[in-house]
């Protein structure tokens, strides 16, 4: 929905062009893409900002359109994207290559990384407005370059090679951290403009106060009223419309864990304001400052915050009297004495202990609660006394949960249940109001923002499906088509959530069923980067260049493009450009004979192709039509346990072996077989597993094969392989493991180039 235009008489061609643009922009507003979206401005106001020289932002525009459509598809299917925030452009490219459809870019990693002008630090959005867009520009540039490199290499392939080589989608589907917008409406617009100019299609804006912004999992968060958050969202949409980009706006709320707000002006926030119900208690501010001053007077000069304020003597006297009666001054004296005697306690430590006791005492003595809770207490008391009440307490709570302070007070007076209540008494020294944070407040904030955003995000203090469901159901009760996002934060200790491994594995899937389409590990890349660096640095110190050799072996195993780094970064395409620009006269190609990359093309391990050749012989003998393909990969990413899979032409897995190569104390290589399967009955008892084991023994130079928790099939197979001469001995130890010793002379015979012995093994002539 947008504000309707009034008819304007058109005279000149200039005005006619302007009105055409206004009409086109209005049609754009009215398109299905923006169904349910409210704009607080007109198409005319947008066009007035554009000027006459067209400026195109094709990367952001095309990415935004395609990304939004994909998110809508996922929402309809109740599925989701699970992603993380990369710490480098290489990580972003790898994510897309590994099939993660979208990328998150957070201010946490930007803060932790620092820049040429900013020190690394915590996530307080204290960096310049341009810093996250600058980080985003590097990611987008890396993705576009990866796309160009891929396109060039695919052009050099035959049609058959292209069909066998997957093409990766490097479009910059990114949702980036716009923090609080970094100020007022002009700052929000400037920030969004910078994101669009570098090609970013999505942005999240939160409802924290600029200047006091915290990471979503730090304390001390101060919210802004709902109307202020809506202004930010509207300003972002306004800038996107000016730039003709259907960007994806995510409205984040921190209301679940916040306890402060900088204004009581918005009616939607008022049900959650906390106030004193005992009005003879000195204000929270005066008591807090009097406590600080007491520390100062007792010689702790570092605690001097009271000097910022000009509290009157009478206020200090009233607050001091209350602190004395509550025993807080006594606690201050005890803490200061202990600090002097101990010498080891920090000033922050002794202050925090006393402050916690003060807060609990003040809240208790002031009867701190929301106005709705105060009225409910009056109604419940009247009900318990048998007095007639005009509304049941539960009915009142339902009403008060959405009522403004004005409406709630009017209703309470009508019921004869208007208790004393004052939120001004509970204000902090900085002037912030105290609020009742929690999921109900986060729901209220998100419902207010929903018509102005494409996706809603409630920041949470832990990972909890029940909390997510409560939020999703409340939002979808009023906005059934509203897409949601969820922070799978590394700030959570996932092993303290009470979830099993399987529940953690399925957590993103369960979120998708609730309508959470974009679920992300905010600074996952930062932790990946750190742990990988620690592991490699340790290995380098312990094992010298063997550490790098092991890394290169792993790259070959998983067929990582990092195995050929010059190609990865675009060496062949660069040489092609050099040839084009020099009329093919250049003799300085980077990928020529002098490139050490050719060393990485040398086959240092037994190739999978050898087993595929054996399987072709085997298939021919048994007249099987499928052309079999061999895949060797870690069973799970990062695992030392490997899986060798045999696949048919339709990519169905026909057989597999789960195993781990290990070395014993004497340096002998042992294959530890955990599981093996032949999935098609028609493939069994044809020595398929024998061929697979022969190749594994050859590939890993194994001296023995151990079968863990073996089955009867394992017993039969190993005895048959012994009869074929592949094993010299087969022993079963205590029923839990089969130990088979490899017969290397027989292995050598089976590996001879003429393949006579191998063919006899396949055809069962031997």
UniProtKB/Swiss-Prot annotation:
**Can you tell me which residues form the catalytic site?**
215 (proton acceptor)
Q: How is its activity regulated?
A: Inhibited by itaconate, itaconic anhydride, bromopyruvate and 3-nitropropionate (3-NP), when M.tuberculosis grows on fatty acids, but not on glucose. Succinate at 5 mM inhibits the activity to approximately 50%.
The main enzyme category here is: lyase
Write out the pathway annotation from the protein's UniProt entry. Carbohydrate metabolism; glyoxylate cycle; (S)-malate from isocitrate: step 1/2
Q: Which GO terms describe its molecular function?
A: isocitrate lyase activity; metal ion binding
Note the superkingdom of the native organism: Bacteria
InterPro entries, alphabetized: ICL/PEPM, Isocitrate_lyase, Isocitrate_lyase_ph_CS, Pyrv/PenolPyrv_kinase-like_dom, Pyrv_kinase-like_dom_sf
Keyword tags: Glyoxylate bypass, Lyase, Magnesium, Metal-binding, Tricarboxylic acid cycle
Record function comment: Involved in the persistence and virulence of M.tuberculosis. Catalyzes the reversible formation of succinate and glyoxylate from isocitrate, a key step of the glyoxylate cycle, which operates as an anaplerotic route for replenishing the tricarboxylic acid cycle during growth on fatty acid substrates.
Q: Please report which protein family the annotation says this sequence is part of.
A: Belongs to the isocitrate lyase/PEP mutase superfamily. Isocitrate lyase family.
Q: What is this protein called?
A: Isocitrate lyase 2
> Which classification does the entry list for the species?
Bacteria, Bacillati, Actinomycetota, Actinomycetes, Mycobacteriales
């Amino acid at each position: 929905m947008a504000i309707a235009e009034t008819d304007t008489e058109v005279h000149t061609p200039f005005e006619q062009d302007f009105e055409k643009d206004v009409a086109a922009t209005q049609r754009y507003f009215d398109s299905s893409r923006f169904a349910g979206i409210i704009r607080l401005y007109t198409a005319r106001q947008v066009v007035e900002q554009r000027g006459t020289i067209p400026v195109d932002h094709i990367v952001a525009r095309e990415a935004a359109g395609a990304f939004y459509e994909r998110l809508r598809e996922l929402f309809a299917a109740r599925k989701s994207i699970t992603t993380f925030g990369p710490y480098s452009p290489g990580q972003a490219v790898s994510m897309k290559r590994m099939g993660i459809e979208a990328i998150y870019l957070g201010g946490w990693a930007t803060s932790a990384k620092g820049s040429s002008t900013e020190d690394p630090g915590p996530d307080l959005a204290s960096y310049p407005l341009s810093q996250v867009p600058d980080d985003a520009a590097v990611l987008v540039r890396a993705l576009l370059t990866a796309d160009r490199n891929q396109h060039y290499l695919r052009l050099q392939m035959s049609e058959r090679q292209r069909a066998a080589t997957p093409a990766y989608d490097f479009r910059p589907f990114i949702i980036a951290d716009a923090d609080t917008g970094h100020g007022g409406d002009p700052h929000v617009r400037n920030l969004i403009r910078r994101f669009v100019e570098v090609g970013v299609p999505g942005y999240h804006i939160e409802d924290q106060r600029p200047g006091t912004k915290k990471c979503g999992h730090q304390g001390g968060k101060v919210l802004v009223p709902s109307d202020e958050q809506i202004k930010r969202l509207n300003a972002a949409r306004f800038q996107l419309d000016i730039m003709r980009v259907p960007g994806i706006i995510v409205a984040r709320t921190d209301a679940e864990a916040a306890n402060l707000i900088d204004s009581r002006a918005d009616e939607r926030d008022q049900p959650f304001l906390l106030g004193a119900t005992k009005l003879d208690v000195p204000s929270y501010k005066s008591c807090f400052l009097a406590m600080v001053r007491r520390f100062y007077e007792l010689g702790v000069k570092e605690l001097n915050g009271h000097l910022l304020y000009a509290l009157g003597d009478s206020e200090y006297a009233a607050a001091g009297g209350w602190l004395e009666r509550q025993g807080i001054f006594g606690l201050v004296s005890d803490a200061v004495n202990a600090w002097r005697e101990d010498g080891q306690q920090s000033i922050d430590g002794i202050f925090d202990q006393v402050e916690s006791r003060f807060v609990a005492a003040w809240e208790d003595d002031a009867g701190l609660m929301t106005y709705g809770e105060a009225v409910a207490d009056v109604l419940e008391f009247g009900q318990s006394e048998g007095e007639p009440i005009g509304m049941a307490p539960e009915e009142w709570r339902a009403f008060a949960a959405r009522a403004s302070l004005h409406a709630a007070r009017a209703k309470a007076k009508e019921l004869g249940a208007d208790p004393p209540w004052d939120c001004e008494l509970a204000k902090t020294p900085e002037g912030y109001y105290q609020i009742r944070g929690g999921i109900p407040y986060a729901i209220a904030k998100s419902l207010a923002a929903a018509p102005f955003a494409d996706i809603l995000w409630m920041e949470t203090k832990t990972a909890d499906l029940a909390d997510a469901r409560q939020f999703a159901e409340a939002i979808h009760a009023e906005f059934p088509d509203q897409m949601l996002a969820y922070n799978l934060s590394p700030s959570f200790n996932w092993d303290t959530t009470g979830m099993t491994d399987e529940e953690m594995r399925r957590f993103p899937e369960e979120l998708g069923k609730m309508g959470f389409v974009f679920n992300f590990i905010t600074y996952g890349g930062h932790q990946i980067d750190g742990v990988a660096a620690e592991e490699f640095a340790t290995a380098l110190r312990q094992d010298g260049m063997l550490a790098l050799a092991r890394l290169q072996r792993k790259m070959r195993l998983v067929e990582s493009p990092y195995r050929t780094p010059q190609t990865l970064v675009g060496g062949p395409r660069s040489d092609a450009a050099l040839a084009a620009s020099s009329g093919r006269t250049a003799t300085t190609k980077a990928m020529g004979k002098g490139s050490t990359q050719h060393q990485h093309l040398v086959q240092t391990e037994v190739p999978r192709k050898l087993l595929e050749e054996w399987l072709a012989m085997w298939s021919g003998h048994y007249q099987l039509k499928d052309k079999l393909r061999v895949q060797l990969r870690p069973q799970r990413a990062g695992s030392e346990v490997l899986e060798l899979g045999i696949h048919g032409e339709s990519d169905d897995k026909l057989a597999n072996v789960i195993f781990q190569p290990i070395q014993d104390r004497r340096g002998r290589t042992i294959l530890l077989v955990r599981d093996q399967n032949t999935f098609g009955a028609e493939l069994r008892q044809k020595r398929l597993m024998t061929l697979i084991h022969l190749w594994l023994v050859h590939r890993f130079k194994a001296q023995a094969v151990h079968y863990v928790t073996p089955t009867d099939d394992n017993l039969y197979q190993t005895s048959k392989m012994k009869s074929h001469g592949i094993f010299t001995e087969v022993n079963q130890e205590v029923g839990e493991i089969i130990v088979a010793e490899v017969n290397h002379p027989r292995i050598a015979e089976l590996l001879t180039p003429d393949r006579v012995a191998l063919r006899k093994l396949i055809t069962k002539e031997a």
